[in-house]
Every structure is written in structure tokens, then in C-alpha cells.
Amino acid sequence: MKKPHPILAYLLPQPRDILFIGVFFSMVFGGTKLFNNDGDLGRHITIGNYILDTGTIPTYDIFSHTMVGERLVLHEWLSQVIFALAHRVMGLSGDVFIAALLGALTILIVYEELIKRGNFRLVALFVATLVTVVSSVHWLARPHMFTFFFVVLWTYGLERFYKNESKSSWYFPVLMLIWVNTHGAFIAGFVVLGTYIVDWIWEFLQGRGSKEMGKQLFLIGLLSFAVTFINPSGVYLWGTSVGYVSNEFMTSHTVEYLSPDFHEKD
């Protein structure tokens, strides 16, 4: 079979291009759903605008009526600023654009990493599509879209580091510093790191894991943990993040934590 001309081959869309464009425009065309299915976007934009206008990040509540003066932990302040900036430039379309870009990049990285790890393109495309379908329930113009993106970047970095494809241990505390100021689910990064540490312990007990790798993994964890305190609320951020997932009332009334309801039509 004759191969196409190099220029033609370059111009023809690749599976990764189709995947990225498909996810991106699926979110863009479903823009109204991205913010109508959740009431938090207005609050995020308001807080972001306050930070942009005043140049300060409030640590005490100035937005509510009943809790004025109480401690306020803005665990999403950086993403709120980004959403506010996007809103100033493009209105609500800007916020949809940010969410769609994060979603498409997340799925693209998953696909590319699957290819790199030796999976057939068809298998990688199937898995990436499956991830897309499963995650689509959470396609909203909210800060948690940054966590989707950061989880993939974090796992990508750990996989390369664990397989000795990279020695950049600084990558993790830098990424964690951004993550911890963007969304409260930064704890997911430590959960993922924990799985690699458990695997290293198992390999070490079998005589296959090196002491140096173990030291590096624990050092990554220590440095990444240390930078989590570099945020406007300091140690209180951990209390908010851990407190939320351990709050039975909150988790029982938040869709993300509920079991799937197969009787819903939407």
C-alpha cells in the first residue's frame, strides 16, 4: 500500500487530534449545561473578581450574612481568579472555554500516555473514550476541572520518575504548590503517590526495588507535603479539605459522592 505524501500525512487528522477536538467541542456545545447544572460558578467569579479588584485574598468571610467575620478558607482562590479573568474577557463563554480546554487536555494526556506505554492505538482510544464518558458527569465550569488535569499531570510525572525516565523530583512540589492553591482535592496527589510507594515496598521486599528510589519517593512526598502550607490559609486548608470528605452530611448531599442513580433520565 502506497504511503501518503508527508505533507498530506501531516495535514490529515490523527486519532489524538480527533479525540481532543471531539472532547473540546462536546463541552463547548454543551456550554449551558456546564454552568446551569451547578450553582457555584457565580460565587467563584465573585470571589475571583474581589481578589482581582482588591489585590488581596480574604481569610475571613465577607460574602455571607450569617457568617461574616468567621474564618474563610479559600481553597480554590487561584482557579477562581482564572474563571473571573476568563469571564471579564469573554463572559460566560470564557469560563466554558477554560473548562473545555482542561477537559480536552486531560483526555489527550491520558491517550498519549497509553500509547507511550505500549498500548495499541485502538485500545488507547477505547480507554480514553471510556474515561471521557465516565468523567463527563463532572464536566462543569468549576475548579475541580483543574484537579482532573493535575491528577493526570501528577500521575504522568510519577510514572516517568518511577521508571527512571526522569530525575526531576522538583516537578512534584512545584505542581503541588499550584494545585494546593487551585482546588482542595490536592489530597488526591498524595493518594496516587501512596500507590507508588506501596508498589516500591512490595518490589523492595522481593529484592527488586532500589533503596534510592524509595528515598526519592519519600522525599517527593515530604517536599510536596511541605508546600501545601504555602497558601493564604496555611494549616487550616488541610482542615477544610479533610473535614469535607469526612463530613457525613456534606458527602450524603453532594452528587459527586453519591452512588450512581440509573433511574435518572439525564
How would you label these PLM feature ranges?
Residues 52, 57, 184-197, 201-266:
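Transmembrane catalytic cores of multi-pass membrane glycosyltransferases
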